Regions:
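Short, charge-enriched, intrinsically disordered boundary segments that mark the beginning
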Residues: 1-12
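P-loop NTPase catalytic cores that bind/hydrolyze ATP
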Residues: 24
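Short, well-ordered alpha-helical segments
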Residues: 27-29
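Cytosolic juxtamembrane regions of integral membrane proteins
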Residues: 31, 35-107
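Hydrophobic alpha-helical bundles in membrane proteins
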Residues: 74-315
């Protein structure tokens, strides 16, 4: 007869671990857990400790988003999450470059002379955008832990900032910060200790292009104000870039992992563009329609590509 402690531990395993892993390791894990838990009161009233629960949840993340030694669909899901994280790094690099240039505390005064006006909000915004850039660079240069810490701190700061808003601004704030939260979650879930660092050379080039493109357009917007073209291209750079990448992926009949990663990002970026469309920003309605069509097509292609038998592979 099972003790209450064993039942509670098995319940923890059911919640935290995928079925394929439990089928292979559950009995072994239960035996090891109960080996030194022999006290009758403990068996009747005891619970798995916080340390055990935390370790089990961490194992669950590593096995649900595995890089090897798991069913094919599980490995593919892990690859999708890691791709979402890397695309998110490019997105945050572009947003960071835009933010650093657009949030510089300057105003035009006395003709072309720039006069600095520093305030706490501007300082926090500037530091946050610099941290976003540093986190993106850290990730593509192999400093995964640094990147995860920086993006985690940014997510917390932005969450506090949204919590201070009221009314419709809360919803808009949530939509604006969704990309950084998605990036952080994907980094933490996908790049766990068992996941190898992928080849980063092409991602370094991609980040350089992302930062330089966003920076050039934003600088043009600042210097050429009030010309609308610069503002429009700067605002739409990230979703247009992801959209073009998605179209190219479909045209080349790329794999399901790439399709799901790009499709997911089109879904994440779509709500903010819908807000722009509500304010009748030029070209945004057409962009929203294209993002919706291409995003759905990518997700359908990706999900179809993952429909294959899942075979457990024990290392």
């Amino acid at each position: 007869m099972r003790s209450n402690l064993e039942n509670r531990y098995r319940a923890l395993l059911r919640v935290a671990l995928p079925g394929w892993y439990r089928a292979e390791r559950e009995e072994e894990m239960v035996g090891l857990f109960l080996a030194d838990r022999t006290d009758e009161l403990d068996l009747e009233h005891g619970w798995p400790g916080w340390g055990e629960a935390g370790a089990t949840v961490a194992l669950g993340v590593r096995t649900r988003f595995a890089a090897s030694g798991a069913p094919a669909r599980t490995v593919a899901l892990g690859d999708v999450v890691r791709l979402v994280a890397l695309i998110g790094v490019l997105v945050q690099g572009a947003y960071g470059a835009q933010g650093v240039l657009s949030m510089l505390p300057v105003t035009l005064a006395e003709g072309d002379r720039l006069v600095a006006e520093v305030d706490p909000f501007t300082v926090v915004a500037l530091v946050s955008n610099v941290a976003m850039l540093v986190g993106a660079v850290a990730m593509v240069t192999g400093f995964r832990t640094t990147a995860k810490v920086l993006f985690g701190l940014l997510s917390a700061v932005f969450l506090v900032g949204v919590g201070r808003d009221a009314g419709p601004e809360v919803v808009l704030g949530l939509l604006w910060q969704l990309p950084v939260w998605v990036t952080t979650a994907a980094l933490l879930a996908g790049f766990h200790r068992d996941a190898p660092t992928p080849e980063l050379k092409r991602w370094r080039w991609a980040l350089a292009g992302s930062v330089l493109g966003a920076g050039a357009l934003t600088a043009g917007n600042v210097l050429a104000y009030p010309y609308v073209l610069f503002a429009l291209t700067s605002m739409l750079l990230v979703p247009v870039a992801v959209l073009v990448a998605g179209v190219v992926h479909l045209a080349r009949r790329g794999g399901p992992v790439g399709a799901l990663g790009l499709g997911w990002w089109l879904v994440v970026l779509l709500p903010v563009e819908l807000v722009y469309a509500a304010y009748s920003v030029p070209l945004v309605a057409e962009l929203v329609a294209a993002m919706a069509v291409v995003g759905v097509a990518l997700l359908v292609v990706g999900l179809r590509g993952l429909r294959r038998p899942a075979t457990a592979i024990t290392p």
